[in-house]
Amino acid sequence: MTEGTYLDSILSYHRERAKNDLRSLDQLLKEISSKEKTGPSFQEKILAEKGLSVIAEIKRRSPSKGELKGNLDAVELAQAYERAGAACVSVLTDYKHFGGSKEDLLNVRRSVKVPILRKDFTVDLRDICDA
């Protein structure tokens, strides 16, 4: 498969999921607006860093490389990244193609103080709400 084919397949999968997502966008927006900020934003953290900043990534597999580390503990790895000085942690949440999950994102969010990025394919406003 070529990279374009991987991307086409992944985007098609996410567009289909978005089409079948029946959650109320208004309700999701209300939920987001009621949440308290828990720490610095990604932008605030990066701008506050002196020199180079590292965004560490949690990824179990990739469509092009296959299994990378399927049995990794996302929380343990995020904490190790934070101790090592990572400015932010990027968590893949696509299970089908990358082995990630929303649970990984939530668990990592609870376990570290650095900003967390949800890394996924964003094809719908609900995806932004999920982030």
Q: Which stretches of residues belong to each language-model region?
A:
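An N-cap/entry alpha-helix motif that binds or orients negatively charged groups
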Residues: 2-69
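Alpha-helix-loop-beta-strand connector modules within alpha/beta enzyme cores
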Residues: 39-50, 99-123
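Glycine-rich beta-to-alpha transition loops that act as phosphate-gripper elements at the mouths
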Residues: 57-61, 68-72, 95-99, 118-128
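Alpha/beta enzyme core
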Residues: 68-92, 110-112, 126-130
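Short, glycine/charged-enriched secondary-structure capping and boundary segments
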Residues: 25, 70-71, 103-106, 131
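Structural preference for beta-strand elements that scaffold enzyme active sites
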Residues: 53-57, 88, 115-117
